[in-house]
Amino acid sequence: MTTLLALDTATEACSVALLHDGRVLSQYEVIPRLHAQRLLPMIQSLLAEAGIALSAVDALAFGRGPGAFTGVRIAVGVVQGLAFALERPVLAVSTLATIAQRAHREHGVDQVAVAIDARMDEVYWGCYRAQAGEMQLAGIEAVLPPEQVGLPRDSAGSWFAAGTGWRYAERLAVTPAATDATLLPHAEDLLRLAVHGWQRGEAVDADQAQPIYLRDNVATPKAPR
């Protein structure tokens, strides 16, 4: 039976989840700016709770973004380091999809419009529909001014709004049926999405674990020309 380890540090929340012997264990903390200090201890604690060594993990999943640049880089760095050391593949999972999956789990909704506060007067935006329990992207993920967001062209029925970007609901050009602007990504939901990806053969080598920022001017140094 597959053992998967998932982690997410793309927002204020830091979380890890483990699938082992068909059982899911997880830890979740909202700890802005403390992800780098807490992530590895949380992983070690979860492995100890499951009674397994890190070497028992078959693959690692991580929140690829979009989100806070530093947080996304922490997740990529830790996953690549562990995956290289263990010679295990990785699965990159969208932060927006993870929030949609959490909304599906906690609120029982099948259509979710996710908005994360992207600063600079923009939001990270994506719309998702449930297919056999998996929240799948309808359209594209984008970074946009709130006034430019929209539902998929084939949209029908009611949509649930999730994510911190919905704190600016009066500016977002979509009217949802209900809203939870407090939802942050949880590794338990990232893990669920990663399981679907694993079953489809989407795992890649560690050096292919790349962040998705959606914004070009990220806070990383550029090589001189």
Q: Where are these predicted regions, by residue range?
A:
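A glycine- and small-aliphatic-rich helix-loop capping segment at beta-alpha/alpha-beta transitions
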Residues: D21-V24, V76-F84, A130-G133
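Glycine-rich phosphate-binding/hydrolytic loop that grips phosphoryl groups
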Residues: D180-I212
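Stable alpha-helical structural segments in soluble proteins, enriched in small hydrophobic residues
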Residues: L46-A50, A85, A103, L190-W198
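SAM-dependent methyltransferases
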Residues: M1, R200-V204, R215, T220-R225
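Surface "functional belts" at beta-alpha junctions
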Residues: R23, L34, P89-P185, Y213, ...
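DPxDG-like acidic metal-binding loop motif
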Residues: A61-T95
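N-terminal beta-alpha supersecondary unit
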Residues: M1-R64
